[in-house]
Amino acid sequence: MRRPDPCQERARELCLAAGIDPESRVGEGRGQPAWCLYRDAARKEKLAREADAASSEIAMLRPQEERFKNAPLKVFGEHDAATIKQMRNCMAVGNVVSGVICADGHLGYAQPVGGVIAYEKQISISGVGFDIGCGNMAARLDVRFDDIRATAPTIIRDVAKVISFGIGRKNIEKVEHALFDDGDAWRESDMEAYRQKATGQLGTVGSGNHYVDLMRDEAGFVWIGVHFGSRGLGHTSATRYLKAAGGKDGMNVPPAIVDEDSELGRRYIAAMQLAGRYSYAGREWVVDRVRQIIGGKVTESVHNHHNYAWRETHGGKDLWVVRKGATPAFPGQRGFVGGSMGDDAVILEGVDSPEAKASLYSTVHGAGRLFGRNEAKRRFTREEMDRWLNERGVTLVGADLDESPMAYRRLPEVLAHHAGTVKVLHTLRPFAVAMAGEGEFDPFKD
C-alpha cells in the first residue's frame, strides 16, 4: 500500500495560487498532474519548518561558549531557507570559529552538502557524514581521444564489466593493498572486525552520483575521472561513532560533536583517517584498472577528498575544518570537480585572496542539485536524459533518472559564484560515463 504524500496538499495549494488546475496534465505522453511540479517547493517548506523545530532542540544541548556564538558564515551563491537554517543550526553547537556554504550547497544529513565548518579542538561526526573520504580523482593519459573515438563505447562497457557498481558489492578481482597489513590503524580505530569485509569491497564504486567518467581536455588527451568514497567501511564507522556520541540520523538533527582529546574523539579520528586512506586506495585502484583497459600511461593526476575533517591553520589558529561536499582549495592546490552527468568537468587550482580566506580555502565539489532524487524521477524521463546525452556525444552505461543532468545546476554558473577564489586549469569534456544501474538505493551516497 502506497504511503500518503505529506507534501501533496501544500503542493496543490501552491498550484492553485499560481492559477493552475492541480489536476491538469503536464509533460509528454500522459504526463503528470500539475501539482507535482510544486511538490519540491512544498517539500522545502516542510524542511524549513523542521529546521526551525530543530533549533529548539539544539538550544537544549550544552550551552555554546559566548566566544563561539554568532560565528561568521560566508555564503556563496543562492540557497533556499531550509539550507541556510540547517547550516545555522549546525553552527549553534560546539566550538565553531566560522562556516561556509559553497555555491553547490543543498540540504544534507545533519549538515548541508557544500557546508564547511571550522572547529576549535572538536570534530563533527555528522558533518563528515556517512561516506567518509568521498572524493574525486582524475588522471590524464598519454592517449588521444581521436585514437579511441571509435572504440569508446566498447571501452566504457568493458569498464562496467570489470568495475563493480552498486550497493554492498564486492570486487570481482582480489585486491591486495598495504593498508590491510597496517594492524595498528585497524586496532586504534576499533575497526579490526571489519577488515575482511573492507578488503572485498576495495575498488568498488557504489551507486547514485558515484561514477567512472572518460573525458578529453583542450589538447585532445584522455582523462579518467572517478567519484566515490569509503564504501561500507566508512558507513559502518560513521554509524558506530555517531551512536556512541549520542547523535541522531536525519536531516534536521543536532550535529554530533566530539572533543579531539577524548577517548571517543581519538578513536573516531583514527577511524576517519583509516576510511580516508581506504578511499584513496580504492580510487587509485579503479583509475589504474581503467587505464589498463584503455592503454597508455598516466602523465598527470589530481586527487582529493570532499567529505572529511582536516587539521588546518586559519587566522593563526589550529583548527579542525569539516568539509561535507566541499573541495579543499588552498593557494596552489589543485582539485578535480565534476559537473552533472555529461557536463564538462574542471581541474582547478586555489588562489590567495580575501575571498579565498573567507571560504576557508574551500570550493564546490560538483554542480549541485536543483531537484531531489524523487523529484527528478517525477519530472524527467529516460528518453529526455538519453536525448540530452546523445546530443553531446556521451555514451552512458547504467544510471537512473535521479542522476539526470536536468536535475543539476550547470557547473560554470556555480563556479562563477566562487570567482577570485579558484582558477580553472583544464576543462574536461566527457564522452563516456559508467554508473550503477536503475533501482540501486543508497541513502548516504552524498
Where are these regions (language model features)?
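Short secondary-structure transition/capping motifs
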Residues: 31-35, 144, 148, 403
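Core catalytic machinery and nucleic-acid-binding channels of phosphodiester-processing enzymes
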Residues: 105-108, 133-140, 225
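Domain-length cofactor-binding catalytic modules of enzymes
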Residues: 57-86, 94-100, 107-113, 117, ...
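A generic, well-ordered mixed alpha/beta core segment in the N-terminal half of proteins
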Residues: 125-186
